[in-house]
Amino acid sequence: MTQQPFQLPHFYLPHPARLNPHLDEARAHSTTWAREMGMLEGSGVWEQSDLEAHDYGLLCAYTHPDCDGPALSLITDWYVWVFFFDDHFLEKYKRSQDRLAGKAHLDRLPLFMPLDDAAGMPEPRNPVEAGLADLWTRTVPAMSADWRRRFAVATEHLLNESMWELSNINEGRVANPVEYIEMRRKVGGAPWSAGLVEYATAEVPAAVAGTRPLRVLMETFSDAVHLRNDLFSYQREVEDEGELSNGVLVLETFFGCTTQEAADLVNDVLTSRLHQFEHTAFTEVPAVALEKGLTPLEVAAVGAYTKGLQDWQSGGHEWHMRSSRYMNKGERPLAGWQALTGPGTSAADVGALLADAVAQRARSYTYVPFQKVGPSVIPDIRMPYPLELSPALDGARRHLSEWCREMGILSEGVWDEDKLESCDLPLCAAGLDPDATQDQLDLASGWLAFGTYGDDYYPLVYGHRRDLAAARLTTTRLSDCMPLDGEPVPPPGNAMERSLIDLWVRTTAGMTPEERRPLKKAVDDMTEAWLWELSNQIQNRVPDPVDYLEMRRATFGSDLTLGLCRAGHGPAVPPEVYRSGPVRSLENAAIDYACLLNDVFSYQKEIEYEGEIHNAVLVVQNFFGVDYPAALGVVQDLMNQRMRQFEHVVAHELPVVYDDFQLSEEARTVMRGYVTDLQNWMAGILNWHRNVPRYKAEYLAGRTHGFLPDRIPAPPVPRSSPALTH
């Protein structure tokens, strides 16, 4: 290779890499095993020399340093299998663009991961099936049914990405920085690798496996693995192979900076993700363990798993430093007094740990709120879909005003009549569902009022008091206001509870308990996300862009409104269609577009008048160290990319989903209607932001911000209140 395009930056390495002493055993075993499975000579994919050059034994010995010999051999076999699968799929299906054969191949693989031991397996037809059958049989006896289910799903997702890659069109475009980080997470194998970390260390208890803190651990783990790889592989991928999916190239292109500056910035992002990992491990994981009532042994299991992910990070770095596959010479030198030598001193890099990393970590906590920023700048926002409004709009406005007064929303010191009118939530609802009847529009307006009021209430009432405990109590009680099957409902103690009980009864009257469940989860996710925002507010912690975007979808209440859209679809569309990658991609593109749109319009309101830190423009400013115009450019581009992604999924990916799931014409009609619903949703939200006073500079300048005079917010109601049956 030619001269390196940049010097490697100082890496944040708080944990030394360690090598498993059973390395040679794993190397020898994996070679024998691969030959027995038919992966080597005669496979048309690998020879033994290929396997030896890859040296997956060394990778696994570094990333799983503490497990015993048989466990390391099994884990190494899993990595041999997954890399062989990838190369096998490339040779057999990608090169020939044979979708039908590729899909048939993928459809059989779940048959070799039965959740029930008695289910049996078909006879393997190729080395991929033979390897999976053998590995599953050797692995699952030691693990619980919950782990089997999670690992089977993670494996299916990892394999199915090959199918979507085969179907997608390579647009030849360098991604937006925030979009890129999220994209790498989607196509990576982090949940799969994390499952094997559980096998090597300790299984995560089912009670917390699906919680946000454990998800964040896995996602920050994933981001750090991918960004580290981008730094080491830039020269090979970008200069030698012409690859566009590299984080250094993404930042270099988008910010117009030098390659060295982009590499340093990628390392800042990598360091931030590791800080997020540590922050979650030290603050959110203990809290959720306490909340879920984990036993000491279960807490120890979560700790061992967390340490296992840290070991994977350290070992993965050491692997990159030693592999001939990567650019790994010339890390930027330290000052003489800082340069330590000897075994294990990479983790004692004083410069990295006490200078750059500390300054970078502090950036998230040193933001000064209530800065004067002036009116929000509204850039060119692309909207290809026409606006339609429900003719029931005027009636909904009158009804919402009366309903809010009845519920007590206008008498708690957060909203008054003027503030409600400035929101004009029926205008938003009328655009979201232009075909709505009067009753439907009244109900939709009520849901928007509940969500918007709660979003204002939590930071104002609990944030100023720094009272996270009271906020958690409120969140728990709100969940209790949504019974699935006749459970007792607490007597309402404030306007939020009163309005939610009313909305729940009116919305779910004709639903079964199973139909109510996703709606309840959507509301729970939204109120839990308000707690996340509140926790950051109390700590004065500006989140990083990826974590922010993930949580913003929940705080915006998007799943709630989309769930109401889907509720009338009936059984024609199977649930797995909604869970498919393209449909989730479609929904997330629309959701992100709307959330970012809100942040652009609300920038002055939130930053200058409310001291808010949860705004995408501010998050990008803080994270990348750029000014308002540059950050606004990133957010504007991300919005427009999300719209293009939405259009791409509709045109190219949904037809493939319809065929893959063999949907009936009725189901296809329902899905086309759902796409129209999403188009109306985006057009209606843009129209609402453009026309309501809530975000306009002249309205903001004339308002009282904070608690309204003469109105006292209702205190939280004790948990022990007698219940009512509703």
UniProtKB/Swiss-Prot annotation:
EC identifiers of the protein: 4.2.3.22, 4.2.3.75, 4.1.99.16
Motif (DDXXD motif 2): 455-459
Segments of this protein annotated with the region Geosmin synthase: 355-726
Gene3D superfamilies (UniProt xref): Farnesyl Diphosphate Synthase
Cofactor note: Magnesium. Fe(2+) or Cu(2+) ions are very less efficient as cofactors.
Cofactors named for this entry: Mg(2+)
Pathway assigned in UniProt: Secondary metabolite biosynthesis; geosmin biosynthesis; Sesquiterpene biosynthesis; germacradienol biosynthesis; germacradienol from farnesyl diphosphate: step 1/1; Sesquiterpene biosynthesis; germacrene D biosynthesis; germacrene D from farnesyl diphosphate: step 1/1
Motif DDXXD motif 1 positions after renumbering to this chain: 86-91
Keyword Magnesium appears in the UniProt entry: yes
Xref: Pfam families: Terpene_syn_C_2
Residues binding Mg(2+), per UniProt: D86, E91, N267, T271, Q276, D455, N598, S602, E606
The reaction(s) this protein catalyses: (2E,6E)-farnesyl diphosphate + H2O = (1E,4S,5E,7R)-germacra-1(10),5-dien-11-ol + diphosphate; (1E,4S,5E,7R)-germacra-1(10),5-dien-11-ol + H2O = (-)-geosmin + acetone; (2E,6E)-farnesyl diphosphate = (-)-germacrene D + diphosphate
Entry keywords, A to Z: Lyase, Magnesium, Metal-binding, Repeat
Region (Germacradienol/germacrene D synthase) residue spans: 2-354
GO MF annotations in UniProt: germacradienol synthase activity; germacrene-D synthase activity; metal ion binding
InterPro entries: Isoprenoid_synthase_dom_sf (IPR008949), Terpene_cyclase-like_2 (IPR034686)
Family membership: Belongs to the terpene synthase family.
Domain notes per entry: Consists of 2 homologous sesquiterpene synthase domains. The Asp-Asp-Xaa-Xaa-Asp/Glu (DDXXD/E) motif is important for the catalytic activity, presumably through binding to Mg(2+).
Note: The earthy odorant geosmin is also responsible for the 'off-flavor' of contaminated drinking water, wines, and other foodstuffs.
Function in brief: Tow-domain protein where the N-terminal domain catalyzes the cyclization of farnesyl diphosphate (FPP) to a 85:15 mixture of the sesquiterpene alcohol germacradienol and the sesquiterpene hydrocarbon germacrene D. The C-terminal domain partially converts the germacradienol formed into geosmin, the characteristic odoriferous ('earthy aroma') constituent of Streptomyces species.
Name of the protein this chain belongs to: Germacradienol/geosmin synthase
Gene name of the encoded protein: cyc2
